[in-house]
């Protein structure tokens, strides 16, 4: 615990005072603009200052005063080490694995959809929500699960709240988890369908991760930096070579898969990944994916500082009354339901009580992994908000409004957008579609295309050329697919643990991580559940993302409330009620 205590010197006080002043100025620029375009760099600075202050002071207070983290306390990864699920893991590798697991579709898609209300409401919730709720929940659940041998959320609820409450939480969490995984997987399917470049590059990360797992465990143990460089280089080569694969007549057709084919591939992959030892595929693949995730997000932030794009969307639009075309619902509660993971997410509680606590090497690492990981995800949400709001509002609504509102031609879409109170011309929509290499950008709902176009727009402004718009657009689509797929990996494994815990009430032997039958049963229920919903969404587009996303948002927040209730009860039992 002493290692976390930071000395407050005069230079340190001056630095943090400067950070606070910069943050205050940035918020002032965002909040006090009078109908003028605000530069996106103020949003980046405001977020960076909030995250820095929250991590330096608030998370340290929680770690030392509330949780009293002890570096000398043996973690379950050491006491129960089995080489399968309980494996002491380097804190940077585990941070990568945990971040990759929690950062799915939510922080990318949610803020983009919420941008129809303006950039300010969503930004405030992304920052305030994560500091006071989301990061605290992740930190809390990871802490209490690590102190309880890595038990799942449902099992801890049964232990702390009683058998009936525990079973209710287990069943509710399992149902919500299946819906969440279905939404995540469906977004991946929509992004990769008929995209040989994306399919090849995503598929290539599997053998690369297997190689990294074997390399770190048997060939060069402990050489984290070395294997990281190798894995990153191989992944970049896979992405670059994917363009050549897509252009090849034979291999391009081979890797061109329909939505149904991709669904079955994901089901098979999810089953295999969940039963393999965590060190072999899951941890190295998530760690590998994190390089791309964090690298792209930080690179995008630097790009915003260089390009200095303006936020074209108003701070607040008239759609806060619930009449918006992107999603129906007023500011409260639909803004919070829609943004979901970027501020607080119940899904994180399942990951923080599923795979991650079984891998913690030292208890003091929980602060960086739990609180820090969630701050990083919120920053992803901020980047998504910027990508949506740097676009002309007319273009934003042309991409995100459904076909029932826009029609099927650029002329009808331009007229529909004008009726919404914004201006866009058919020529603008046609030229933009050509620049990103698509036949049309109309009604490309789901958030992913908007993020990709916004990212391509920002990068093009850096180089003052739109010649590479198509490349950056498809790179961003690939990035989003990889971003989301890693959450499906870890979520399926966490779902397996939940099934084993429930069946273990009747058959105790099934609960053991060494039970091969329990592993197969839990995995089959997990992938069968979310696979069914994904398949239905693929064959019936009306029952896809548009229907599942509201269920995802509501269920996600409900699960977060369960986790916070459980955490509150445990803090009371620890005699920490004065901090609640």
Tell where the protein language model's regions lie, with residue ranges.
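Extracellular/periplasmic helix-exit of transmembrane alpha-helices
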Residues: 304-320, 375-454, 490, 535-543
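Transmembrane helix-loop junctions in multi-pass membrane proteins
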Residues: 25-37, 108, 120, 178-194, ...
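Membrane-interface helix-loop-helix modules in multi-pass membrane proteins
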Residues: 28-34, 85-148, 159-163, 179-194, ...
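Selective recognition of specific alpha-helical transmembrane segments in multi-pass small-molecule
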Residues: 49-59, 173, 178-180, 234-238, ...
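Membrane-interface "cap" regions at the ends of multi-pass membrane proteins
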Residues: 2-22, 53-108, 290, 330, ...
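Extracellular loop-to-transmembrane helix junctions
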Residues: 37-56, 60, 114-144, 154, ...
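Loop-to-transmembrane helix boundary motifs in multi-pass membrane proteins
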Residues: 160-178, 370-379, 445-447, 465-476, ...
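Flexible loop linkers connecting adjacent transmembrane helices
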Residues: 2, 60-87, 113, 127, ...
């Amino acid at each position: 615990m002493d290692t976390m205590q930071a000395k407050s010197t005069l230079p340190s006080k001056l630095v943090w005072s400067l950070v606070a002043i910069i943050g205050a100025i940035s918020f002032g620029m965002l909040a006090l603009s009078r109908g003028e375009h605000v530069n996106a760099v103020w949003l980046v600075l405001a977020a960076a200052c909030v995250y820095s202050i929250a991590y330096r002071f608030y998370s340290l207070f929680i770690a030392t005063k509330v949780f009293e983290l002890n570096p000398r306390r043996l973690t379950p990864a050491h006491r129960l080490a089995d080489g399968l699920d309980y494996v002491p893991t380097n804190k940077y590798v585990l941070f990568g694995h945990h971040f990759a697991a929690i950062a799915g579709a939510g922080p990318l898609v949610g803020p983009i959809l919420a941008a129809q209300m303006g950039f300010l409401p969503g930004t405030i919730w992304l920052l305030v929500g994560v500091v006071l709720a989301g990061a605290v929940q992740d930190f809390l659940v990871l802490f209490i699960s690590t102190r309880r041998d890595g038990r799942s959320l449902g099992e801890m609820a049964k232990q702390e709240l009683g058998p009936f409450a525990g079973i209710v939480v287990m069943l509710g969490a399992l149902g919500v988890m299946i819906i969440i995984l279905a939404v995540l997987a469906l977004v991946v399917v929509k992004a990769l369908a008929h995209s040989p470049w994306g399919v090849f590059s995503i598929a290539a990360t599997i053998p690369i991760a297997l190689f990294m797992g074997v390399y770190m465990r048997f060939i060069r143990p402990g050489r984290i930096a070395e294997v990281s460089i190798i894995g990153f280089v191989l992944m970049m080569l896979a992405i670059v070579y994917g363009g050549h694969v897509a252009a090849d007549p034979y291999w391009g057709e081979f890797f061109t898969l329909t939505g149904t084919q991709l669904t079955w591939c994901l089901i098979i992959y999810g089953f295999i990944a969940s039963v393999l030892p965590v060190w072999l595929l899951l941890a190295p693949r998530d760690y590998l994916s994190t390089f791309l995730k964090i690298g792209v997000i930080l690179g995008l932030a630097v790009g915003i500082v260089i390009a200095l794009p303006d936020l074209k969307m108003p701070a607040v639009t008239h759609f806060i009354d619930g009449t918006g075309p992107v999603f129906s619902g007023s500011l409260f509660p639909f803004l919070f339901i829609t943004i979901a993971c970027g501020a607080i997410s119940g899904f994180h509680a399942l990951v923080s009580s599923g795979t991650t606590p079984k891998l913690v090497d030292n208890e003091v690492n929980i602060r960086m992994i739990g609180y820090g990981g969630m701050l990083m995800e919120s920053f992803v949400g901020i980047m998504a908000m910027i990508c949506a709001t740097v676009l002309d509002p007319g273009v934003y609504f042309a991409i995100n409004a459904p076909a029932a509102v826009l029609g099927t031609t650029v002329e009808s879409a331009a007229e529909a957008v004008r009726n919404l109170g914004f201006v866009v011309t058919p020529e603008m929509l046609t030229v933009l579609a050509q620049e990103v290499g698509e036949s049309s950008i109309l009604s490309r709902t789901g958030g992913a295309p908007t993020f990709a176009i916004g990212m391509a727009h920002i990068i093009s402004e850096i180089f003052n050329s739109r010649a590479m718009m198509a490349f950056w657009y498809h790179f961003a689509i690939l990035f989003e697919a990889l971003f989301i797929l890693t959450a499906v990996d870890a979520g399926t494994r966490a779902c397996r643990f939940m099934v084993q815990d429930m069946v273990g009430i009747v058959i105790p032997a099934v609960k053991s991580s060494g039970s091969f039958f329990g592993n197969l049963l839990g995995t089959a229920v997990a992938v069968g559940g979310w696979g069914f919903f994904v398949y239905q969404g693929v064959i019936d587009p009306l029952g896809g993302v548009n229907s599942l996303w509201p269920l995802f948002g509501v269920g996600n927040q409900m699960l977060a409330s369960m986790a916070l209730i459980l955490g509150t009860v445990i803090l009371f039992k620890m005699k920490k009620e004065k901090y609640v």
